[in-house]
Design a protein with these regions (language model features):
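N-terminal export/targeting leaders of redox proteins
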Residues: 1-43, 93, 213, 223-226
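Axial heme c-ligation environment in periplasmic c-type cytochrome domains
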Residues: 26, 64, 73-81, 95-135, ...
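Electrostatic cytochrome c docking/interface patches
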Residues: 26-58, 126-152
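The feature marks the first
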Residues: 41-53, 57-97
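Extracytoplasmic/secreted proteins, especially bacterial periplasmic and envelope-associated proteins
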Residues: 45-49, 87-90, 104-107, 119, ...
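Sequence context surrounding c-type heme c attachment/ligation sites in exported
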Residues: 47-63, 85, 89, 148-160, ...
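Protein kinase-like catalytic domain
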Residues: 50-51, 66, 96, 147, ...
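The canonical Cys-X-X-Cys-His
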Residues: 59-68, 120, 156-165, 218
Length: 226
């Protein structure tokens, strides 16, 4: 038997339909308005900040330590040219955290805005790295064996499995090592082993299994990779 809806029920039904339609319309519009605009890194601004710093903030020019176009000539300071943009930005961010606290870089990184970090990373990523050279002929074979094959008895994997056969690395996750200063690479392995650098559990584990001589040998070999 058909029964007519009361005026109240009809009004309520219409109101619910209207609310449902409005909610649906808002849901459809959300993605367009909810998505925050992605700000693209400005390599030009990064180049200026890298070369000149910002005297007003007491921020020195990166070039004074890391060299023209990111090709450091100081063995203790890393070459940054050609490193992956995302990786570089990640390291600048991590310098502001306890996991990679470093006396010099932590202070500078904290002075940079998020945009400035990205700009510098974008600039360095497109620079051409200059080659290095292995210097110790007596240990180059040991370094080569460790880099290419690891040390099975110590459960040390081949460095090449993550950093590539020629040390070019893998974008974002594993940095370029080819041509890097031996002194810097040894310093980082030592920091991983001793706990001063804690932003990679994988590298900390590997470094703890390497002796000083093994670190020096593989770091010297890596310096000569092209």
């Amino acid at each position: 038997m058909n029964r007519a809806f009361s005026p109240f029920v009809k009004s309520l039904f219409v109101a619910l339909l209207a609310v449902s339609a409005a909610a649906s319309a808002n849901q459809e519009k959300k993605p367009a308005h909810a998505e925050a605009a992605v700000v693209k890194a400005d390599a030009g601004k990064g180049a200026t900040l890298y070369a000149e710093g910002d005297a007003a903030r007491g921020l020195p020019a990166c070039v004074s330590c890391h060299g023209a176009a990111g090709n450091s000539t100081i063995a203790a300071n890393p070459k940054l040219a050609g490193l992956n943009e995302v990786y570089l930005n990640k390291q600048l961010v991590e310098f502001t955290k306890p996991e990679r606290n470093q006396p010099v870089m932590t202070g500078f990184a904290k002075m940079l805005t998020d945009a400035e970090k990205k700009n510098i990373a974008a600039y360095l990523a497109v620079q051409t790295p200059k080659p290095g050279a292995a210097k110790n002929k007596d240990t180059v074979e040991l370094g080569k064996r460790i880099y290419r094959g690891g040390i099975a008895e110590k459960s040390v994997p081949a460095c090449a499995s993550c950093h590539g056969a020629s040390g070019t690395g893998m974008p974002i996750q594993y940095p370029r090592l080819g041509g890097q200063h031996q002194d810097y690479t040894v310093a980082q392995l030592t920091a991983f082993r001793g706990g001063a650098r804690k932003n990679s559990a994988q590298m900390s584990t590997i470094a703890m299994r390497l002796s000083d001589d093994e670190m020096k040998a593989v770091a010297d070999y890596v310096a000569g990779l092209k």
